[in-house]
Amino acid sequence: MNSISSVFSSEQSVFIPYISLGDPDYDSCVIWADALIRGGAGILELGIPFTDPVADGPVIQKAFKRSLAHPFSMDKILEVTSEIHKLHPQIPLVYLTYFNPLFSMGLESFTERAKNSGIQGLIIPDLPFDTPEAEEFFSQLERKRIDFIHLVTPATTEDRIRSMKSLASGFIYYVTSYGVTGERGSIASGLEDRIRMVRKIVGLPVCAGFGISTSDQSKVISTYADGVIIGSAVQRIIEENGSDRNNCADKLLAYASEIRASMR
């Protein structure tokens, strides 16, 4: 099993696609993950569906709605995660999740089982890092060697970024634009300078996400970001083709290969 940090040991930017677990069903997600990894994913983000995904745009909200149309359980989430890990044990898996599903399961139980299923990192958009609850959770993650990946937005101050330094691990998820997730037509101005500043302060790889969907965008961003994160464009392929597993897997493989080939 490779660590997240080892994935960033080469000079090439890392492709990090995202899928919503359970969309359109759990078995299909193993096939989607396999296609994306074969297409060049270096890390895979797995979204845990939630009823109130405040940071997510319409594509991922609809994916969660489709996922939650089936019986939901963290047991099934962990089982599917383990299946993906067994197929590609060399690829680090990261959960992108809201805090409530983890809290409902019990944080100690979750961290133990997540680690055993192959999870190496967590991204939790609605968990502030400077609360007593977060500090206790971070201690549990550290004991299990699970990275906590912090989000930095265009509005995050330099002082707040500095305060993340002692707690952040794995990489920094840099949110490239204001608002929720979703595909956008242009790259935000000043993105390169901002990413370089965050990397200098925190001393971790910085990966860019939110709004990236095309190979032209990934080609440019990969020249200065350590990784490129793409979620909504991947989920749109699943939304439009998920009823035909073979066709959808082929389209995901082709898309991942195109993005990977564009990156520096």
Curated annotation (Swiss-Prot):
Coiled coil: none annotated. It catalyses: (1S,2R)-1-C-(indol-3-yl)glycerol 3-phosphate + L-serine = D-glyceraldehyde 3-phosphate + L-tryptophan + H2O. Belongs to the TrpA family. It comes from the Bacteria. It comes from Leptospira interrogans serogroup Icterohaemorrhagiae serovar Lai (strain 56601). GO terms for cellular component: cytosol. The active site is at 45 (proton acceptor), 56 (proton acceptor). Keywords: Amino-acid biosynthesis, Aromatic amino acid biosynthesis, Lyase, Tryptophan biosynthesis. Pathway: Amino-acid biosynthesis; L-tryptophan biosynthesis; L-tryptophan from chorismate: step 5/5. Tetramer of two alpha and two beta chains. GO terms for biological process: L-tryptophan biosynthetic process. PROSITE patterns: TRP_SYNTHASE_ALPHA. PANTHER family: TRYPTOPHAN SYNTHASE ALPHA CHAIN, CHLOROPLASTIC, TRYPTOPHAN SYNTHASE, ALPHA CHAIN. The gene is trpA. The alpha subunit is responsible for the aldol cleavage of indoleglycerol phosphate to indole and glyceraldehyde 3-phosphate. Its EC number is 4.2.1.20. SUPFAM superfamilies: Ribulose-phoshate binding barrel. GO terms for molecular function: tryptophan synthase activity. It is an enzyme of class 4 (lyase). InterPro entries: Aldolase_TIM (IPR013785), RibuloseP-bd_barrel (IPR011060), Trp_synthase_alpha_AS (IPR018204), Trp_synthase_suA (IPR002028). This is Tryptophan synthase alpha chain. Pfam families: Trp_syntA.
